[in-house]
């Protein structure tokens, strides 16, 4: 098995059901070798992973950190340490952050050895404060009064998944620096292991910002380089970041007010000096009474002289004079006023002569009388045609009223069905006592000497008078 670089007790902070607590573990740091990668393992109790000790050591579930994924190892300050005199440090990976603690000496040693193992290219040896400073050839000493503006204002944060962070490609751990005028997000370089600026947000473009026990969040405006959106960072120092941002904003406000006052004072003094050195040059004014030249401007660009507001184009009927036109100051007539007036009078005379045309603006819109309806505007559909049979319908309540009789005009009575003419009756002949063929010639001659015709139409009589012995009869409709 690989030999351990360092091992010892470490307190690991865990969070369960919203409660943070410290758990004491036994940590073992393994370097990179042909048999394994560099890693930090945690066990329940002291013991060697090679089988030594009482029954060997049992590793905690999912408690192994690969140092190849380590992003940073920095000391931090916690409010409630696991025991008095303990110092904490945070180990950040691409997935999450681990908060560890040990006594002061062990914590410093753990940070040093972890940095050497995780970042072998950098010189991470901690400076010994007890040793005197080494002078170079130029004999340069460190200035104890010098400190960068962001010292104490850099915080390790872990980006949380939001719409804005996904758009900017933020994932993992970064350093958030609170500067005097902006928030800057730093990341470690791929080769130099130096913090390089990635994004920044000026305070004047932040819409709002806030903090929680485990995170710090702010909303950027649309004019920020990152674009609009909310950025959330997980950190245990959210309150410290919030206070630093608030102090920077208040300081920037105070500087802005002082700068505005200085600018105003400088502007006033500069204006006073300018007025004392040089007086304004008088602008030549044109004489008020000089009339405009006739052809100074084209006809289309003639301007109406300033005066009271004129009435609208169709506010009054044609030819009417607005009230108060002759009172007050007389208006100056335009250049071609006489010509326009003459043309308007000619048009008015033409309209008055033509009596067929109606005036255009005599009546207001919408108040003209409605035209009379024609005779056939409202046709009525005839009903009961099968009963009327094209005859005039005569009923008492629909006939015209007669005021003389206080009644409706009653139609004349209808004629009854026509009766046919009476049938003609046959001629009744007196009965003769003699038989036919008996008698003398004289009687027969007297009987049939005359033929009687009836004037009744439809009746026919045929009478013939013969002289002889033959008997001639008269036939009628009544005879058989």
From Swiss-Prot:
Region feature (Disordered): 253-328, 398-480
Transmembrane helix among keywords: no
Major subcellular location class: cytoplasm
Post-translational modification: Constitutively tyrosine-phosphorylated. Phosphorylated by TEC. Phosphorylated by LYN. Phosphorylated on tyrosine residues by the insulin receptor kinase. Results in the negative regulation of the insulin signaling pathway. Phosphorylated on tyrosine residues by SRMS.
Family: Belongs to the DOK family. Type A subfamily.
Organism: Rattus norvegicus (Rat)
Ranges of residues in domain IRS-type PTB: 151-259
Compartments it resides in: Cytoplasm; Nucleus
Biological processes, Gene Ontology terms: cell surface receptor protein tyrosine kinase signaling pathway; intracellular signal transduction; macrophage colony-stimulating factor signaling pathway; Ras protein signal transduction
The entry's keywords: Acetylation, Cytoplasm, Nucleus, Phosphoprotein
UniProt biased composition (Polar residues): 446-455
Biased composition (Basic and acidic residues): 265-276
Subunit text: Interacts with RasGAP and INPP5D/SHIP1. Interacts directly with phosphorylated ITGB3. Interacts with SRMS (via the SH2 and SH3 domains).
Biased composition (Pro residues): 410-423
Cited InterPro entries: Docking_Protein_DOK, Dok1/2/3_PTB, IRS_PTB, PH-like_dom_sf, PH_domain
Ranges annotated as biased composition (Low complexity): 253-262, 432-445
Annotated PH domain residues: 3-119
Chain positions with Phosphoserine modification: 48, 269, 290, 415
Role noted for this protein: DOK proteins are enzymatically inert adaptor or scaffolding proteins. They provide a docking platform for the assembly of multimolecular signaling complexes. DOK1 appears to be a negative regulator of the insulin signaling pathway. Modulates integrin activation by competing with talin for the same binding site on ITGB3.
Domain notes: The PTB domain mediates receptor interaction.
Sites of N-acetylmethionine modification: 1
SUPFAM superfamilies membership: PH domain-like
GO cellular component term, pick one: nucleus
Source organism, top-level taxon: Eukaryota
Residue list for modification Phosphotyrosine: 295, 336, 340, 361, 376, 397, 408, 448
Protein name as annotated: Docking protein 1
């Amino acid at each position: 098995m690989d030999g351990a670089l360092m091992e010892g007790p470490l307190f690991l902070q865990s969070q369960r059901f919203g409660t943070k607590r410290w758990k004491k573990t036994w940590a073992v740091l393994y370097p990179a070798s042909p048999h394994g990668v560099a890693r930090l393992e945690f066990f329940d109790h002291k013991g060697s992973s090679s089988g030594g000790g009482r029954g060997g050591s049992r590793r905690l579930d999912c408690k192994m950190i690969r140092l190849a994924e380590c992003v940073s190892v920095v000391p931090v300050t916690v409010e409630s340490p696991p025991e008095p005199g303990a110092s904490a440090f945070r180990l950040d990976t691409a997935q999450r952050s681990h908060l560890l603690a040990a006594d002061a000496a062990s914590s410093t040693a753990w940070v040093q050895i972890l940095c050497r193992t995780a970042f072998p290219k950098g010189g991470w040896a901690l400076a010994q404060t007890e040793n005197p400073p080494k002078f170079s050839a130029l004999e340069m000493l460190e200035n104890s009064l010098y400190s960068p503006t962001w010292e104490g204002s850099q915080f390790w944060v872990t980006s949380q998944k939001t719409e804005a962070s996904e758009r900017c490609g933020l994932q993992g751990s970064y350093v958030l620096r609170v500067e005097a005028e902006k928030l800057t997000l730093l990341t470690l370089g791929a080769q130099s292991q130096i913090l390089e600026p990635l994004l920044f947000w000026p305070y004047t473009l932040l819409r709002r910002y806030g903090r929680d026990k485990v995170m710090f969040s702010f909303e950027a405006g649309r004019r920020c380089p990152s674009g609009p959106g909310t950025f959330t960072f997980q950190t245990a120092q959210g309150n410290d970041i919030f206070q630093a941002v608030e102090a920077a904003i208040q300081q920037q406000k105070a500087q802005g007010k002082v700068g505005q006052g200085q600018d105003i004072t400088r502007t006033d003094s500069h204006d006073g000096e300018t007025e004392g050195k040089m007086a304004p040059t008088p602008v030549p004014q044109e004489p008020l009474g000089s009339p405009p030249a006739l052809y100074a401007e084209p006809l289309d660009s003639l301007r109406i002289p300033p005066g009271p507001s004129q009435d609208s184009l169709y506010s009054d009927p044609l030819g009417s004079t607005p009230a108060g036109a002759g009172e007050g100051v007389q208006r100056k007539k335009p250049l071609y006023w006489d010509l326009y007036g003459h043309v308007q009078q000619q048009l008015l005379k033409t309209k008055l002569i033509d009596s067929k045309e109606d005036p255009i603006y005599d009546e207001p819109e919408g108040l003209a009388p409605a035209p009379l309806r024609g005779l056939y505007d409202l046709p009525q559909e005839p009903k009961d045609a099968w009963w009327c049979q094209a005859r005039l319908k005569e009923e008492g309540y629909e006939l015209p009223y007669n005021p003389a009789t206080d009644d409706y005009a009653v139609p004349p009575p209808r004629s009854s069905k026509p009766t046919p003419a009476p049938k003609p009756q046959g001629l009744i002949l007196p009965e003769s006592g003699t038989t036919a063929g008996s008698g003398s010639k004289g009687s027969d001659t007297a009987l049939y000497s005359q033929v009687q015709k009836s004037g009744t139409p439809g009746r026919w009589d045929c009478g013939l008078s013969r002289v002889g012995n033959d008997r001639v009869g008269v036939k009628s409709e009544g005879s058989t």
